């Protein structure tokens, strides 16, 4: 029967079918010592269905063989007055065939009698239940009363064995996973056996929960045991039972990629979640909380356990119950809200292990579960809501807790950024304020938190890989030259799109920041200029240092480099580590790396150049086996690189400031203002084009012109204060500015036009006198463009007071 390719296989199947139909197998129970036949019968049947892939042809054992064997074994169980414990062991062992730990053990140490695995199960990524598992499940379902009794006795024996010293136990110890328990070594071996039994219980609940009706009360008793190991194990087990999670483990976490493009929308999010295979799909045939209410209530009380490890385990499994909706059986609204409140309380636990476990649990939720489950009691700014308490953890006193919390909170916002940009409720009200909570941690004045915020900003909130810079070209049958032409034709458009897509993410972030967070955001951006100067000095010193090889002035060069390294190191939490890294980088003396860092900082570098340079720098450092250096170099590049104030972003920012797409105009205008005042160099590439736009849109006495010109004037005004020589000097441009000062419908536009004119014109006195004369001509309160002329006069009094005074006299 184990070899379907056998010439007599049809006859073998016929004999088995006849045996199952006639039930003559019951005769063996009347023999003396029937167990000597019954035990090999069960072993042989399970071996046959599990060893089918060993057939010479690779042909599978027929399904009717499995079916008839099940009927034969059920008949034996029904007719046997007493079932040998070995038979029960064989049956329940089949449920461990889907346990990755057992398969790993069998692969390393050879197959065990209680955990035989056929060759198609050698991988951990099983796709379906093995035949032996299905046979054992069918037997338990066909003989519920007998199997309930025998399985209860089986687990009772295991629990009794675990309650006495290891030297007095009399049952074989089977290999199992090493539990994460905190008790003594003497108890450890027995807890291992008990841990294996608890894994079996998880799978039996999924397969045939009826046989566990007498076992669950025993686990409930373990919840109140003195042993921490027992309480921990029982808490984990009941939590997984309620969540419908079997021995194969929980399903993989939903995708939460902050750099995914296009950004996923809430309405489509569930469609992006890959369906796990049947082994990992949570299934609870019955609602555990209703069938075993007493045990479930005892489990809920473990959130108050005196031992942190038990509370941490409780936080983990309660998250699974919420994620799986109690194994698919569903949670009542009040019950779900209660679990969310309890999980939120774990985020404020006095023990850091519990807080870390609760934060990690929240990190397992996908966008739809965050919105519809975790967000039921409010968003990041709702007092005492789960998301608000998670936001508190970004300032946790323990570094590993705040790091996890900040990354998870940032990832939530990043995945939801598309919906936040579109002002989609309830996503906006729940998660819009997440970046504000992260930037608020900046005020702790902790260098470690500052570095963490840098990482979160450029790796999660605004990841360098968002959006993908290179468009994936499909491999078609078209000629290579045609592809090249298409690529060249579409490349400018793709670059523009990349910049616009990224700018929309940046402006969405900026739009949602509160006033305190906004100040932090712009302080971080303004820091780029000072850091750029410092890093430039460092790179120049590295070049003089020449990897430690000198021709002259050795002491002076070393002293100069040491001074700069010390200055840069003070901005890191571990100054000694940062100093060592910067010295090592100088000794490596990779000139290409120096150039790459300069590319990332240069105001003339577009975003594509900055990202490529950053990635190449990271690759070069890793290839040279200097990966630890990135702990210092990455934050340094994030702080000095042109990652947000970037020249290729300017057209997209200007466009959004005019079109107000998705309500981003105000944020775009504020960004332009900050760029023009803090880092006007990035405007240099666009300033000539901006000035041409101003000329084209200039108002006249008969028309007010384009209102969107105000934003361009504001940006040019900031640029003119720092780099006036870069602006055009043509008379046509100055005439356009004069027209803005006199005829614009916006007083602000008039003010900015006067500022540009006074900063750039060689004959500004002449223009000032001319403007004053024209402003006061036929100028009475309430006259046409009264406020525009008033704004122009006030600005002239500030910037050209002598000429204004002369005319006023």
Describe the residue ranges of each PLM region:
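Long internal repeat-built scaffold domains in very large eukaryotic proteins
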Residues: 1-168, 185, 211-213, 217-222, ...
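Residue-level signal for functionally critical sites in structured catalytic/ligand-binding pockets
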Residues: 302, 312, 346, 397, ...
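Extended amphipathic alpha-helical scaffold segments
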Residues: 382, 389-404, 408-426, 437-441, ...
């Amino acid at each position: 029967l184990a070899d379907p390719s056998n010439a007599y296989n049809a006859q073998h199947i016929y004999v088995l079918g006849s045996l199952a139909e006639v039930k003559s197998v019951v005769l063996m129970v009347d023999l003396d010592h029937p167990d000597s036949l019954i035990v090999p019968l069960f072993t042989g049947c399970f071996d046959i269905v599990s060893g089918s892939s060993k057939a010479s042809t690779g042909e599978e054992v027929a399904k009717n063989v499995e079916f008839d064997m099940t009927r034969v074994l059920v008949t034996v169980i029904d007719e046997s007055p007493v079932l040998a414990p070995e038979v029960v062991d064989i049956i329940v062992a089949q449920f461990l065939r889907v346990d990755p730990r057992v398969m790993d053990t069998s692969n390393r140490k050879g197959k065990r009698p209680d955990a035989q695995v056929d060759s198609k199960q050698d991988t951990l990524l099983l796709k379906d239940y093995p035949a032996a598992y299905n046979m054992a499940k069918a037997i338990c379902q066909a003989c519920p009363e007998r199997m309930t009794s025998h399985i209860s006795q089986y687990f009772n024996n295991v629990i009794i064995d675990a309650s006495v010293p290891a030297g007095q136990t009399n049952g074989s110890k089977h290999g199992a996973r090493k539990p994460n328990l905190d008790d003594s070594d003497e108890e450890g071996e027995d807890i291992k056996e008990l841990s294996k039994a608890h894994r079996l219980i998880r799978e039996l609940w999924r397969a045939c929960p009826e046989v566990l009706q007498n076992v669950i009360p025993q686990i409930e008793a373990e919840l109140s045991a003195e042993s921490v190991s027992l309480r921990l194990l029982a808490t984990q087990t009941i939590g997984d039972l309620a969540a419908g999670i079997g021995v194969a483990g929980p399903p993989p976490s939903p995708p939460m990629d902050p750099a995914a493009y296009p950004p996923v929308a809430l309405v489509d999010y569930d469609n992006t979640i890959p369906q796990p295979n049947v082994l990992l799909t949570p299934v609870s045939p019955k609602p555990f909380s209703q069938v075993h209410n007493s045990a479930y209530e005892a489990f809920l009380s473990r959130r108050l356990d005196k031992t942190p490890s038990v509370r941490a385990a409780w936080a983990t499994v309660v998250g699974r119950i919420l994620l799986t909706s109690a194994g698919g059986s569903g949670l009542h609204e009040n019950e779900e809200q209660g679990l969310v409140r309890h999980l939120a309380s774990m985020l404020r636990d006095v023990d850091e292990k519990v807080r870390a476990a609760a934060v990690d649990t929240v990190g397992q939720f996908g966008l739809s579960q965050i919105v519809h489950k975790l967000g039921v009691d409010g968003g990041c700014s709702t007092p005492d809501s789960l998301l608000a308490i998670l936001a508190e953890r970004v300032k946790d006193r323990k570094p590993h807790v705040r790091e996890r919390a900040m990354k998870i909170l940032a990832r939530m916002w990043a995945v939801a950024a598309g919906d936040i940009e579109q002002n989609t409720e309830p996503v906006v009200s729940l998660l819009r304020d997440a970046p504000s909570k992260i930037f608020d941690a900046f005020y702790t004045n902790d260098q470690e938190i500052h570095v963490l915020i840098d990482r979160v900003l450029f790796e999660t909130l605004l990841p360098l890989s968002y959006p993908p810079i290179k468009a994936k070209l499909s491999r078609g049958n078209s000629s290579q030259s045609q592809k090249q032409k298409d690529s060249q034709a579409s490349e400018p458009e793709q670059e523009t799109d990349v910049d616009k897509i990224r700018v929309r993410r940046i402006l969405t972030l900026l739009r949602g920041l509160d006033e305190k967070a906004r100040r932090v955001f712009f302080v971080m951006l303004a820091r780029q200029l000072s850091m750029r100067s410092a890093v430039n000095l460092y790179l120049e010193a590295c070049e003089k240092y020449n990897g430690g090889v000198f021709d002259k002035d050795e002491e002076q060069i070393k002293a100069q480099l040491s001074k700069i390294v010390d200055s840069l190191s003070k901005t890191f939490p571990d100054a000694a580590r940062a100093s060592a890294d910067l010295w090592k980088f100088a000794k490596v003396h990779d000139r290409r790396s120096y150039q790459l860092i300069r590319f990332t900082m240069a105001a003339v570098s577009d975003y594509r150049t900055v990202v490529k340079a950053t990635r190449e720098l990271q690759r070069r450092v890793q290839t040279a086996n200097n990966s630890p250096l990135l702990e210092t170099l990455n934050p340094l590049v994030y702080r000095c690189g042109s990652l947000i104030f970037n020249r290729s972003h300017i057209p997209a920012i200007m466009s959004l400031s005019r079109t107000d797409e998705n309500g981003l105009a105000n944020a775009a205008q504020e960004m332009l203002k900050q760029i023009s005042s803090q880092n006007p160099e990035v405007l240099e590439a666009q300033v000539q084009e901006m000035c041409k736009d101003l000329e084209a849109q200039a108002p006249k006495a008969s028309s007010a012109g384009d209102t969107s010109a105000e934003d361009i004037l504001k940006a040019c005004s900031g640029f003119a204060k720092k780099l006036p020589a870069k602006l055009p000097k043509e008379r046509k441009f100055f005439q356009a500015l004069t027209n803005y000062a006199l005829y614009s419908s916006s007083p602000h536009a008039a003010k900015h036009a006067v500022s540009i004119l006074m900063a750039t014109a060689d004959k500004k006195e002449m223009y000032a006198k001319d403007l004053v004369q024209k402003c006061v001509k036929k100028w009475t309160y309430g006259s046409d463009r009264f406020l525009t002329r008033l704004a122009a006069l006030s600005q002239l009094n500030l910037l050209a007071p002598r000429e204004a005074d002369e005319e006023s006299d």
